[in-house]
From Swiss-Prot:
Record organism: Streptococcus mutans serotype c (strain ATCC 700610 / UA159)
InterPro entries from the UniProt entry: EF-Tu_GTP-bd (IPR041709), EF-Tu_GTPase (IPR050055), EFTu-like_2 (IPR004161), EFTU_2 (IPR033720), G_TR_CS (IPR031157), P-loop_NTPase (IPR027417), Small_GTP-bd (IPR005225), T_Tr_GTP-bd_dom (IPR000795)
Name this polypeptide is given: Elongation factor Tu
Region (G2), start-end ranges: 63-67
Chain segments carrying region G4: 139-142
Oligomeric and partner information: Monomer.
Keywords, alphabetical: Cytoplasm, Elongation factor, GTP-binding, Hydrolase, Magnesium, Metal-binding, Nucleotide-binding, Protein biosynthesis
GO CC annotation: cytosol
Enzyme Commission identifier(s): 3.6.5.3
EC class of the enzyme, as a word: hydrolase
Reactions catalysed, as given in the entry: GTP + H2O = GDP + phosphate + H(+)
GO molecular function: GTP binding; GTPase activity; translation elongation factor activity
Cell compartment(s), UniProt: Cytoplasm
């Protein structure tokens, strides 16, 4: 547990890179950290190379990013926590947890390819998990000689964004080469700086739900010898500080109480973690096996575990990557809440025999484990590793 205090003088924003596999998300992440370290040197702005961001061994063996890398950097205006979201379709599950943490995202599209299946999927996921602001970085422009082709690709990206209710005509599109910027090409470094100015200006300072009761979805749990158990994740709303009493809610039938003995972010101690911060929370009296991913830390009494609710859902079409066939009563997919999948059964409204791809319907859901949910909690419906629907809890039933 580090002792250095975390600087809060600049607004803090969570962003990330999304887009199709091999379009240059990780290279762009490396370029942003490297160019900012050259142009705006500070304790925070440290260059990260491709291999350190692409860190987990299975990623490098397969040449695909799997886990979610967190890096930090700052512009003159802001402090950023940046997630390099996985690109490969098998790892969409991780993408969902990553995208859920973003105030805005940079959609990376290779100019050589244009939008690809995962470009569409990531735009859809951003829409589902509430990422409101996207900025487009058209990468690899150095490999395209034809100006008209670049214009065509840009139009195609804008149309795709509009299709998913993003303001496709107004979204900023920056064209450049992340690799050339990384290699020190001055003109391309300027473009990376232009991208960051655009991110500063286009993504508004997030409105934080600091006045609401604490809700922190647990992403990871580890123990520190002699100190206790740490639960980490992004604070969804509210605040947490030392000596606060919290409840651990969901998955298990009983609710546990714990006392917070430490809060840290980027290895620095915090007086208080607030909504939007990625923090580790040290809990007194909790064993490593008494808390798990998928649970939440919450202000006592503020949220309860439920297994039955009504949900308003949209079922994806085949073209959107959803099911090709309808589903019927008692369909049992996975429901993805915040950081975890839970199996549940679906009861259709009286008189509805089946639900077709593209339908919008109210369903009754019964989960096999209780989850901390309330009216307004969003979820994805998943089956065999792919998203087939998206929904919001409209009413708690049990």
């Amino acid at each position: 547990m580090a002792k250095e205090k975390y600087d809060r003088s600049k607004p803090h924003v969570n962003i990330g890179t999304i887009g199709h596999v091999d379009h240059g998300k990780t290279t762009l992440t490396a370029a942003i950290t490297t160019v900012l370290a050259r142009r705006l040197p500070s304790a925070v702005n440290q260059p990260k190379d491709y291999s350190s961001i692409d860190a987990a061994p299975e990623e490098r063996e397969r040449g695909i990013t799997i886990n979610t890398a967190h890096v930090e950097y700052e512009t003159e205006k802001r402090h950023y926590a940046h997630i390099d979201a996985p690109g490969h379709a098998d790892y969409v599950k991780n993408m969902i947890t990553g995208a859920a943490q973003m105030d805005g995202a940079i959609l990376v599209v290779a100019s050589t390819d244009g939008p690809m299946p995962q470009t569409r999927e990531h735009i859809l996921l951003s829409r589902q998990v509430g990422v409101k602001y996207l900025i487009v970085f058209m990468n690899k422009v150095d490999l395209v000689d034809d100006e008209e082709l670049l214009e065509l690709v840009e139009m195609e990206i804008r149309d795709l964004l509009s299709e998913y209710d993003f303001p496709g005509d107004d979204i900023p599109v920056i064209q450049g080469s992340a690799l050339k910027a990384l290699e020190g090409d001055t003109a391309q470094e300027d473009i990376i700086m232009e991208l960051m100015h655009t991110v500063d200006d286009y993504i508004p300072d997030p409105e934080r739900d600091t006045d609401k009761p604490l809700l922190l979805p647990v992403e990871d749990v580890f123990s520190i010898t002699g100190r206790g158990t740490v639960a980490s994740g992004r604070i969804d709303r509210g605040t947490v500080k030392v000596n606060d009493e919290v409840e651990i809610v969901g998955i298990r039938d009983d609710i546990q109480k714990a006392v917070v003995t430490g809060v840290e972010m980027f290895r620095k101690q915090l007086d208080e973690g607030i909504a939007g911060d990625n923090v580790g929370v040290l809990l007194r009296g909790i064993q490593r096996d008494e808390i798990e991913r998928g649970q939440v830390l919450a202000k006592p009494g503020s949220i309860h575990p439920h297994t039955k609710f009504k949900g308003e859902v949209y079922i994806l079409t085949k073209e959107e990557g959803g099911r090709h066939t309808p589903f019927f009563n008692n369909y049992r997919p996975q429901f993805y809440f915040r950081t975890t999948d839970v199996t549940g059964s679906i009861e259709l409204p009286a008189g509805t025999e089946m639900v077709m791809p593209g339908d919008n319907v109210t369903i009754d859901v019964e989960l096999i484990h209780p989850i901390a949910v309330e009216q307004g909690t969003t979820f994805s419906i998943r089956e065999g590793g792919r998203t087939v629907g998206s929904g919001i809890v409209s009413e708690i039933e049990a």
